[in-house]
Amino acid sequence: MERLSGKVILVWGFKRALLAILAGAIGVLALPPFGFFAAMFVSFTLLVWLLDGAAAGPDSGFLGRLWPAFTTGWLFGFGYFVAGLWWLGHALLIDADQFAWALPLAILGLPAFLAIFYGVAAVLARLLWSDGMGRIAALAFGFGLLEWLRSFLFTGFPWNAIGYGAMPIPLMMQSAHVIGVLGVTVLAVFVFAAPALLGTRQGRVPGIGLAVLIAAAHFAYGYYALNLPALPPAAGKAAPVVRIVQPAIDQEAKMDTAADRNAIFDKHLSLSVQPPVNGGKRPDIIVWPETAIPFILTDNQDALTRIADQLDDDQILITGAVRVEDMGPGVEPRYYNSVYVIDGRGQIIGASDKTHLVPFGEYVPFENILGYLGIENVVELPGGFSAAASRQLLTLPDGIKLYPLICYEIIFPNEMTPEIRQADAILNVTNDAWFGDTPGPYQHFLQARVRAVEQGLPLIRSANTGVSAYVDAHGRLISGIDFNEQGFVDSTLSGATVSRIDDSVRKTYFWLIIGIVGMIAVISRMGFISRVN
C-alpha cells in the first residue's frame, strides 16, 4: 500500500486530474441502484492520497498554496456529481425540441457548481492537514461542514450526500435516527478515508482502530434498533389500510395537451377500486401520486362526483393536484403544487401546498435579472408555481395525521417543521417519470427511506412511476411497485418507533461530531507543526 500511495501522491498534470475525477465517479457505485458501499473506501482513500500530494511551490502566496487542494476536491466532486446526476438530462429530452439546449447545463453545469462545495471542503481539510489520523479527521470535518452548507445554500440541493453511501440497507440506516444523514456523513467520510492510513506508518493503528469502532457501532446500533418492539399501529388508533396507486403514465402522455385527460383520470380510478389482493380488507385510504389529477379539480365538479360514485362514504382519497388561488380582478392567479384530501362524498376536506419548489422546474429564480440580461431561454422555462408559506399537516376524519412532502421536498433533512412531531406517517407523492429508468428514481427512494428512519415514522409513497412503496419506521420495504409497473399495493399503517428523537437533538449530535473531528484535526495539526519546527 505504501508504494501505491506514493505513486498516487506523485501523479501530476492530466493524469492527476483524471484520477481525481475517476475517484469521485467510483463513489457513485455506493448509491442506488448499485448499493456497493465498499466503492466509497476506494474513492476516499484515493482522495486522501491526492490531497497528500496537493502541494504548491515554495513561492506561492496563501491562496496559491490552497489552489491545488481546491482543484483536487473540485475534480473529485465533478466526477461524483456527473456520475451521480447525469440522469437529470433525461427530463430535458422529453420535450427535446424546446429544452435540449439546456442539456449541457444539467449534466455538466450543475455538477460543476456542486463540485465547488467539495473543492472548499478539500481546502478546509488541507488547512488542518497533518500526517496520520489527523488528516482523516480533517477531511471528515471539511466534508461534514460543506455537506451541511449544501443542504440549504442557494435554495439547497443535498442530493446524494456522502452519508447515503453508508446506508444501502435498513441495518445500516438506523444511525440516521440519532445523528441524521449529516452526522452519518461525517463519520462515513472518516471510515471511508481510513484505509489511506495503510499507505503510511504514521498514525496507522489509532486511525484504523477508531474507524473500526465507528463502523462496529454503526452496525451494532442498526441491529439493536431493528429488534426493538414496534409501537401499536398509528399510536394506538384504529390502523387503516392504505392503498398506494402507481398508474405508470408516460411523461410524454401527461405533457401532451391532446391526450385524453379523462383516460388518465379513469386509470387512477380503476386502480383505486380494484378488489384487494388475496381477499384482504378494503382500503380505508387511497393515495394517488403528484399532480395525478390532469385538470384543475376545483373547476371540475364532474370529477369530484365521479370520485364520490366510486368511493364508499368512509373512504378517503389523497391525491396530488394543481391548486389555483384567485387573486382578484386583473391579477394573475397563483398556482400551487398541492395535495388534496377528498372524502367519500367527493368533498375536499384538506389540502397542503408545496413549500420548496424545484428551481428552473417549478419556478425560475432571479427571473427579472435573467430577463434583464437577455437570457430569454432560461426565463421561458416551464414553471409558474408559487411556494406556500407553510406546510399543513393533513388530519383525516379518523384522527390519523399525515406529514405531506411533495416530490423532492423529502430530500431536505433540515426542513422538517415541528408539526411532524404530531404526525402518524410521512406522505410523499412524486412523479419520477421525468427521469426514466435511470438511477435517479432509485436515489430518490433511498433518500425518502432515510427520512422515514430519521423521523421514526412510516412512509407512504405514491409515484406516477418510480418506486411507489410502503416503508416502515425503520426504513424496511413492506410493499412496493417497481419502476414503470402499473398497479397498487395495500398495507396496514404501522406505528412509529418506540422512542422518536427530535430534530433539534439530531442537530446537536451533528455539531458535536463536527466539533470532535475538528478538534482531532486541530490537535494533530499543532503536533505536526511542532514536529516540523
UniProtKB/Swiss-Prot annotation:
GO cellular component term of the entry, any: plasma membrane
TM helices/strands, residue ranges: 17-37, 74-94, 105-125, 127-147, 178-198, 205-225, 509-529
GO biological process: lipoprotein biosynthetic process
DNA repair found in the keyword field: no
Active-site residues from the entry: E290 (proton acceptor), K354, C407 (nucleophile)
Residue ranges of every copy of the CN hydrolase domain listed in the record: 245-495
Pathway: Protein modification; lipoprotein biosynthesis (N-acyl transfer)
Keywords: Acyltransferase, Cell inner membrane, Cell membrane, Membrane, Transferase, Transmembrane, Transmembrane helix
Classification via Pfam families: CN_hydrolase, LNT_N
Compartments reported by the entry: Cell inner membrane
Signal peptide: none
Membrane topology classification: Multi-pass membrane protein
Gene Ontology terms for molecular function: N-acyltransferase activity
CDD domains registered for this protein in UniProt: ALP_N-acyl_transferase
Chain's role: Catalyzes the phospholipid dependent N-acylation of the N-terminal cysteine of apolipoprotein, the last step in lipoprotein maturation.
Family from the record: Belongs to the CN hydrolase family. Apolipoprotein N-acyltransferase subfamily.
The protein's name in its UniProt record: Apolipoprotein N-acyltransferase
